[in-house]
Curated annotation (Swiss-Prot):
Full protein name: Aspartate carbamoyltransferase catalytic subunit
A Gene Ontology term for the protein's cellular component: cytosol
Signal peptide: none
Protein role: Catalyzes the condensation of carbamoyl phosphate and aspartate to form carbamoyl aspartate and inorganic phosphate, the committed step in the de novo pyrimidine nucleotide biosynthesis pathway.
NCBIfam families in the cross-refs: asp_carb_tr (TIGR00670), PRK00856.1 (NF002032)
Entry-linked InterPro entries: Asp/Orn_carbamoyltranf_P-bd, Asp/Orn_carbamoylTrfase, Asp/Orn_carbamoylTrfase_sf, Asp_carbamoyltransf, Asp_carbamoyltransf_Asp/Orn-bd
Enzyme Commission number(s) of this protein: 2.1.3.2
Domain of life the protein comes from: Bacteria
Residue sites binding L-aspartate per the record: K86, R174, R226
Species of provenance: Lactobacillus acidophilus (strain ATCC 700396 / NCK56 / N2 / NCFM)
Family: Belongs to the aspartate/ornithine carbamoyltransferase superfamily. ATCase family.
Example of a GO biological process term: amino acid metabolic process
């Protein structure tokens, strides 16, 4: 059995509530699982459901794989055939799941901070289940953030003074918001690039906005973000968007790839728009961590779920 402090949490909805020691412990635990370390022995059944109200392939499947590796009983939930379509609120849906015996909900929702309705309960409310945030609108994406931290740590062994460039549709990216905050606390130096109209001045407290080609030779990590067309309904820049022009200005092409330092890594939360954020034939290149991020996601989500199991004393864990 590995010797480390095990994290206990009642919910896992953002990374801001984690201290650095908890982040480091979760990374070590995920690395332990990846190396084939034993999963905790559950002495009583634990029921979990994945409620994804936005499209997902990687995150949904990754969570379910993590749940099954931990020995949890996964209860199917399909929002397209649920009473949500009849006007049922998220709270009422969760109340029903709680009454049926579900212990933990993994939720992705289009509304920012939807989870507050489920964990900041009023005196007359008695919902009693763990909530794991799989992404809330353009707000936070804690599991993607944590698997990103694991991937960086796995490659470099530390965070202090690493130079990380976050590039692309930053304003609409929940991944960027989670990552920039945590990277800064872990001691990395954050930089931003991409279209200025998808950058908000509120991010200045985390790092400096620069032209991409100025950053390329000095960065340790290039974190590329998907252009989120589905969140641009009221954005006048969407009509003028040109994929080839974006790739030339803000994408990693072969020329920029060759200008990166030998040890630099490229990351992307997926799905990748080929030949927009990244040249399609670089997706499986040596520097690109896209596949490794997905692999690491299963083990990090195992660590996150285990933290909630322990925090809620489920499965006989404490």
């Amino acid at each position: 059995m590995e010797n480390l402090n095990l994290v206990s949490l009642p919910h896992f909805v953002n990374v801001e509530n984690l201290d650095v020691e908890e982040v480091e412990a979760l990374i070590k635990r995920a690395e332990y699982f990846k190396k084939g370390g034993a999963t905790p022995r559950l002495t009583t059944p634990v029921y979990i459901t994945n409620m994804f109200f936005e499209d997902s392939s990687r995150t949904h499947t990754s969570f379910e794989m993590a749940e099954r590796k931990l020995g949890l009983i996964v209860i199917p939930f399909d929002p397209a055939h649920s009473s949500v379509n009849k006007g049922e609120t998220l709270y009422d849906t969760s109340l029903i799941m709680d009454a049926l015996g579900v212990n933990i909900e993994v939720i992705r929702h289009s509304r920012n901070e939807y989870y507050n309705d489920l964990i900041d309960l009023k005196e007359h409310q008695h919902l009693n289940m763990g909530i794991i945030n799989a992404g809330d609108g353009s707000g936070q994406h804690p599991s993607q953030c944590m698997l990103d931290m694991m991937t960086i740590h796995e490659h470099f062994g530390h965070f202090k003074d690493l130079k990380v460039a976050i590039v692309g549709d930053i304003t609409n990216s929940r991944v960027a918001k989670s990552d920039m905050e945590l990277l800064t606390r872990l001691g990395a130096k954050v930089y931003f690039s991409g279209p200025s109209y998808w950058y908000d001045k509120e991010f200045d407290k985390y790092g400096k906005f620069e032209e991409l080609d100025k950053l390329i030779p000095d960065m340790d990590v290039m974190m590329l973000l998907r252009v989120q067309h589905e969140r641009h309904a009221d954005d006048p820049n969407e009509k003028a968007f040109d994929a080839q022009e974006y790739h030339e200005k803000y994408g990693i092409n072969h020329k920029r790839y060759e200008e990166l330092k030998p040890d630099t890594i490229i990351m992307h939360p997926g799905p990748i728009n080929h030949d927009v954020e990244l040249s399609g034939n670089l997706v499986e290149s040596k520097k690109c961590m896209f596949v490794r991020q997905m692999q690491n996601g299963v083990f990090m989500r195992m660590a996150m779920i285990e933290a909630v199991l322990r925090g809620r004393k489920l499965g006989g864990l404490e």
